[in-house]
Regions:
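Juxtamembrane amphipathic/hinge helix adjacent to a transmembrane helix
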Residues: 100-132
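Non-catalytic ligand/cofactor/substrate-binding and regulatory segments of enzyme domains
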Residues: 1-14, 18, 24-27, 32-98, ...
Length: 132
């Protein structure tokens, strides 16, 4: 983990969305980090950010539960993220049914994006680079 460079290997990261998060604090933008800590997030049709979240630096992160990781660990984990990236590059973004949370859920083979959201909030920690 390298908080200064926003690197959180095998973790889900979250950042607030200006105005929206101020009104509803549990709503924000989510991404997933590969085995090297680079973040991947779905922003819209044809747009997958790598190593940069759409709304700024991660405020919270949650390590991915090792019980849901794959046997081949890093290689398979990274392949699943890239597969989800390729799938979502052709998808339209929809605030309720096809968004950054669904991208993370697909990376983890979790059919229910809400389950990923719950897992994140149960395990979220303040990113060390934000504690000052």
């Amino acid at each position: 983990m390298d908080p200064e460079k926003d690197r959180f290997p095998r973790a889900i990261v979250w950042t607030p969305i200006p105005v929206l998060t101020w009104l509803i604090p549990c709503i924000g933008h989510m991404g997933i980090c590969d085995s090297t800590g680079r973040s991947h997030d779905f922003v819209g049709r044809g747009v997958i950010n790598i190593d940069r979240l759409a709304f700024g630096r991660p405020l919270l992160y949650a390590p991915v539960d090792s019980s849901i990781l794959f046997e081949c660990y890093d290689l398979k984990y990274d392949e699943e993220i890239h597969a989800a990236d390729n799938h979502f590059k052709s998808q339209m973004h929809n605030l309720l049914t096809n968004n950054c949370h669904h991208h993370v859920a697909m990376c983890l083979h979790e059919p229910n994006a809400f389950a990923v959201w719950i897992m994140f909030w149960r395990n979220a920690r303040l990113a060390p680079n934000r504690v000052r």
